[in-house]
């Protein structure tokens, strides 16, 4: 048997690698959900037109979809740093949304977050396929996709918990907090780029 199949163990799935992918996917999904869950409240707090948040969220999802058409070229260009640069896009987008003095500047922020996540999502799915033998790939993908729905389900509760912990009700908090998480993920990816837990 090849080394890949040996690493996949008796269950036909490389459990350690799968868990790492699940964690990474869950964290990145949670981070970008600030755009869909918290953007309308932030815009209202800044006295922007909250009605425009629907358009901005639509552009966010459009940006998620776009990289899929060019993923091969993106990965070829970014190489082993693909996840790092994708996280950088997310961080830049969250920062722009947070500090934006003008309503229209939130649009590129949303799109940067979407583009970063739009690269990470299919990349994670692709790597998940490599963690299992062909007969187990559907099961492995199911476990990874569970993290997407868990992040959606738990995101409001996680944000509320940390807002209570830090005694703040600021509408900017979800973007600041998620930016910090993204920066930590970037540091981890950079520090471990030669032998990253989430290496390409």
What are these regions (language model features)?
Residues 1-5:
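Short, small-residue-biased leader/transition segments that mark boundaries at the very start
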Residues 17-58, 64:
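Extracytoplasmic gate region of multi-pass secondary transporters
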Residues 67-79, 163:
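Helix-to-loop junctions at the C-terminal end of transmembrane segments
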Residues 82-96:
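Structural signature of the two symmetry-related core transmembrane helices
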Residues 119-132:
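Intracellular juxtamembrane helix-capping segments at the cytosolic ends
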Residues 134-167:
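A late C-terminal transmembrane helix in Major Facilitator Superfamily
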Residues 159-181:
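A membrane-interface helix-boundary motif in multi-pass transporters
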Residues 174-200:
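Multi-pass alpha-helical transporter architecture, strongest
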